[in-house]
Amino acid sequence: MTDHRTRFLQLALDADALRFGEFTLKSGRLSPYFFNAGRFDSGAKTAQLAQCYADAIDAAGVEFDLLFGPAYKGIPLATALACAYAGRGRDLPLAFNRKEAKDHGEGGTLIGAPLQGRKVLIVDDVITAGTAIREALGIIRAAGGTPSGIVVALDRQEIASEQDRRSAAQAVAAEAGIPVIAVANLADLLAFAAGNADLVGFREPLLAYRGRYGTDTTG
């Protein structure tokens, strides 16, 4: 497992953003783990998280020249990532959307750098159903930008339904024709748990969950 994946999972565990136990998801599934990016709630935590994102993006080799953060969690993530890249000597333009259009001031739903003619990387925490990402894709194209990829913190690598054996990330990637980059995924989480004495007891529930809901790419 590459270093940024290990660093991210340890950071998430330390921040209580990654928790183990029994959690009922919005889908109704009973999950042995839960991820909440909202727990990266300080400058230091967010800065470290952004470095993990940047390392994952660089490892993937995707080409982009603008960062876009979908409202709401994508906004601070994209902003922190832009700061991380500035610290590496790459000053990237940044944009995001608001969910409610304004009829005064700058107006509209878009804030930040113009998207026209840009290769846009979408930055978010997770892809659950894909609704917010699909909305972001439409906004970017309508503004004259070209989506070039999507980056998220964690890919749960679980099927959308028994009828659609793809994950939400796989479905969005196929529909949009662009890569979805994850800082870490369920397979990484399993490897991380196996190497952590405090988490070994959660490995069997994780394996059982993957066996029931995992995509074909989690093995």
UniProtKB/Swiss-Prot annotation:
Any one GO molecular function term: magnesium ion binding
Catalytic function, reaction form: orotidine 5'-phosphate + diphosphate = orotate + 5-phospho-alpha-D-ribose 1-diphosphate
Gene3D superfamilies reported in the protein's UniProt record: 3.40.50.2020
Entry GO terms, CC: cytoplasm
Cofactor(s) required, per the database record: Mg(2+)
Cross-referenced PROSITE patterns: PUR_PYR_PR_TRANSFER (PS00103)
Keywords noted in UniProt: Glycosyltransferase, Magnesium, Pyrimidine biosynthesis, Transferase
Keyword Magnesium attached: yes
Residues noted as binding 5-phospho-alpha-D-ribose 1-diphosphate in the record, renumbered to the chain: 26, 72-73, 98-99, 102, 104, 124-132
Taxonomy, superkingdom: Bacteria
Pathway(s) this gene product operates in, as recorded in its UniProt entry: Pyrimidine metabolism; UMP biosynthesis via de novo pathway; UMP from orotate: step 1/2
A Pfam family assignment: Pribosyltran
Family per similarity comment: Belongs to the purine/pyrimidine phosphoribosyltransferase family. PyrE subfamily.
Protein function: Catalyzes the transfer of a ribosyl phosphate group from 5-phosphoribose 1-diphosphate to orotate, leading to the formation of orotidine monophosphate (OMP).
Classification via HAMAP family: PyrE (MF_01208)
Assembly behavior: Homodimer.
Protein name: Orotate phosphoribosyltransferase
Species, as recorded: Xanthomonas campestris pv. campestris (strain ATCC 33913 / DSM 3586 / NCPPB 528 / LMG 568 / P 25)
